[in-house]
Amino acid sequence: IREPVITNDQVKLYINGWEDRSKLAPRFELTPGATISPASGTVRDFTTPQTYVVTSQDGQWKKTYTVRFITDLLTEYHFENVEYYTFEGVNKFEKLYELDTDGSKTEWSSGNPGYMIASQAAKPKDFPTAQDDEGYIGKCAKLVTRSTGAFGKMLNAPIAAGNLFLGNFTVELSDMAKSTRFGLPYTSKPVAVVGYYKYKPGNVLIDKYSKEIPNQSDTFDIYAVMYESTKDVPYLDGTNIKTHPNIVMMAQIKERKATDQ
């Protein structure tokens, strides 16, 4: 019901709930000369995740992928689980995830990959999006606006706001707002979005040229968007997530205020 989501070693395919996951035979398109084991088109039981090994044409390179077929998505999120994105053996930033009904992961996305480019020496807890211990019950997601330093100023993006969303983040340096690819398939009609938050505004509000905007205060936003995904519009991004004509429903917080409760 949408394009597969392919990350470093994971492949997620979304299908309708009435499909029988115990007998599926996915077919994979590989680079010329590469092989896959088990073979493309093999019938397998995807009620649990299955692994495939891809071997390069010269046989010198092998990589294992975990493939999942997903029918039902979570509707409750607790931010209790976290793992690290690692680069050259170093834990760079935290990735929050939820456990699906079959024990597999639904990962939250954020703008942390973009911030990693701007602030390569930052520790995981210094990134805009990280896990925190001070949740209403248990853990929570902590979103903080951070400076992107000299690199960010060159791109007229002097700050990076903490954010959290379902979907994918692919860095687009020419237009960072297009880096966010929002959304996962839902087949039910949502009724409401309910949760808890704390918020403290920054001391100074600046524009993309790092100039202070007088007599205005920082603010935040919480919203949920349901939109129709098509071949021409497979996803919405930061440039059109609130304005695109494919939007079917939207919920957005109305009363935004600073609170420590």
What are these regions (language model features)?
Residues 210-237:
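Extended low-complexity, serine/threonine- and proline-enriched intrinsically disordered segments
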Residues 70-115:
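Extracellular carbohydrate-recognition regions
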Residues 145, 197-199, 226-228:
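Short beta-strand segments enriched in hydrophobic/aromatic residues
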